[in-house]
């Protein structure tokens, strides 16, 4: 049951202690609740679509470990697989047959992946993909899109400069300008600027990396023809195409966004779902490109915990469950019901907001403007979102604690969960000034 009268005594105590130990009190910035105010809660356990904090407050969870938990928390098959693997040890520093089994499951779903290398995070996978692209092409520059997040490696943690075609400036202290100067940042869904960028710098560009459905600046799908234009143009200039499917892989479809859009990238970056909730990342692609990696080729990459048996076991269990009972029809039904109800609220209430959805991913944007690029997202009403988030949290609904993030559905969510979310959204927005 949802506990509507909440207290956060233990969470507040832990938060005060955490601030003495961790920078900003957290091990990942968004968890600080800095974007929404107040202090974060601390989780004691989770099961299905619910999480419970240390004070005993229950929440319906729409963060789902940032998309990793497509079957919800503590799915029996995943828990069982990790428990069995744990009996055989936590890490070997050597090869395991589990690596091969998980790789085969991924290959069977994504034909573009002829060879694959496991790493420990999406950041590491994106960093490796860029190194591969530079190594095989002999070129140094890369293109990315404003609002697309590819982890916190130096070359990719950048935003656009004063003009759409300028080189990027660092989005963090500690990044030498000489590194970010090799990254060109383009506006999302802008074909004309894309074509101009390739005309000017395409022959110097090793790769263009993108989330095929932008999901780290809220949810912003590509407009019709945009990905096809990008792929065709990249081919003309000999530029590799890297799909960052850390979020969309195995979530939009079994074959990810590349299945949905019918595009086979040169390299694919994966994470989240393929680890069943444990730390993992992967980069895969064409054999001739992937064979540039050491020990076969001259592009170096290594990792002590790469292919960790616990993460491999969890990933195998999750992907086998997906193949055994494909969740996409159920998730689309839930998502469609949610979208229809939210659109009805939009018609009834004067509060200006947008609701974007693709499959089991969705975002609320407090603005009257249609959202088609990161620039549109940056102008949303952050104070209104903060009020919205906090009111939902105190109603037992946990959305991502930032106006710039995407929420997720899982197979553990029920129609009752959706009805409850819709009810609270309506009640909160009806009272909002």
From Swiss-Prot:
Superkingdom of the source species: Bacteria
Family matches, as CDD domains: OAT_like (cd00610)
EC annotation from Swiss-Prot or TrEMBL: 5.4.3.8
List of residues that carry N6-(pyridoxal phosphate)lysine: 272
Keyword Isomerase found: yes
Presence of the UniProt keyword Cytoplasm in the record: yes
Protein keywords: Cytoplasm, Isomerase, Porphyrin biosynthesis, Pyridoxal phosphate
Organism from which the protein derives: Methylacidiphilum infernorum (isolate V4)
Molecular-function GO term, any one: glutamate-1-semialdehyde 2,1-aminomutase activity
Top-level EC class as recorded in UniProt: isomerase
Pathway(s) per entry: Porphyrin-containing compound metabolism; protoporphyrin-IX biosynthesis; 5-aminolevulinate from L-glutamyl-tRNA(Glu): step 2/2
GO cellular component assignments: cytoplasm
GO biological process, one term: protoporphyrinogen IX biosynthetic process
HAMAP family according to UniProt: HemL_aminotrans_3
UniProt xrefs under PROSITE patterns: AA_TRANSFER_CLASS_3
Family affiliation: Belongs to the class-III pyridoxal-phosphate-dependent aminotransferase family. HemL subfamily.
Swiss-Prot/TrEMBL catalytic activity: (S)-4-amino-5-oxopentanoate = 5-aminolevulinate
Co-factor requirement: pyridoxal 5'-phosphate
Subunit-structure text: Homodimer.
UniProt-recorded name of the protein: Glutamate-1-semialdehyde 2,1-aminomutase
